């Protein structure tokens, strides 16, 4: 039997996910296959070492939908235990997606760093502008106080002159 015809696909259930953590993977296999063929197929397709294979036939079950009755199809299931240190990546699309996610995350962090740098520069410029404005306001206040003092002195001088001329 051809290696590609032996394994129909993985069986992904809650129980199979729990078994994956201990190195046991479940596959739907051809009804005509046996343990040794399944072992060779898994080792060839996934490039791993298999410790042991359990195979059993899942019987058909009666299902009802409304008034009609039917049966699920029976199939052969293989539980494949891998040697320690080997794993099978059943979701090949995840790893490139994870890389894309990490790239976008790094790009986002770079963008955030640039934005933070620009914010810091703008805050520094705003601080400089605020200091310049404060200096100008202080200078204007000095000039106004000087002009007020000069005007007061002029008024005092005028009043003194008027008093002196009146005497």
From Swiss-Prot:
Quaternary structure (record): Part of the 50S ribosomal subunit. Contacts protein L29, and trigger factor when it is bound to the ribosome.
Function: One of the early assembly proteins it binds 23S rRNA. One of the proteins that surrounds the polypeptide exit tunnel on the outside of the ribosome. Forms the main docking site for trigger factor binding to the ribosome.
Chain intervals with Polar residues compositional bias: 158-167
Basic and acidic residues compositional bias, start-end: 97-112, 137-157
Stretches for region Disordered: 91-112, 137-167
Molecular function terms, GO-annotated: rRNA binding; structural constituent of ribosome
Region spans: Large ribosomal subunit protein uL23: 1-130
GO annotations of cellular component type: ribonucleoprotein complex; ribosome
Keyword Disulfide bond: no
Name of the protein this chain belongs to: Large ribosomal subunit protein uL23
Listed GO biological process terms: translation
Keywords, ordered alphabetically: Ribonucleoprotein, Ribosomal protein, RNA-binding, rRNA-binding
The organism of origin for this protein: Mesomycoplasma hyopneumoniae (strain 7448) (Mycoplasma hyopneumoniae)
Claim: Protein transport is one of the keywords in the record: no
Spans annotated as Unknown: 131-167
Family as reported in the entry's similarity comment: Belongs to the universal ribosomal protein uL23 family.
């Amino acid at each position: 039997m051809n290696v590609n015809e032996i394994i129909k696909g993985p069986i992904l259930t809650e129980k199979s996910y729990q078994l994956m953590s201990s190195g046991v993977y479940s596959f739907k296999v051809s009804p005509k296959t046996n343990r040794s063929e399944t072992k060779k197929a898994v080792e060839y397709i996934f490039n791993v070492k298999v410790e042991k294979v359990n195979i059993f036939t899942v019987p058909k079950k009666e299902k009802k939908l409304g008034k009609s009755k039917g049966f699920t199809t029976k199939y052969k299931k293989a539980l494949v235990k891998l040697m320690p240190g080997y794993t099978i990546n059943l979701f090949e699309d995840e790893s490139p997606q994870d890389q894309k996610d990490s790239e976008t995350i790094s790009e986002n962090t770079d963008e955030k760093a640039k934005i933070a740098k620009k914010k810091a520069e703008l805050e520094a410029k705003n601080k400089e502008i605020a200091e310049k404005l404060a200096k100008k306001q202080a200078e204007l206040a000095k000039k106004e106080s000087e002009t007020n003092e000069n005007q007061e002195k002029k008024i005092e001088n005028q009043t003194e002159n008027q008093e002196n001329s009146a005497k």
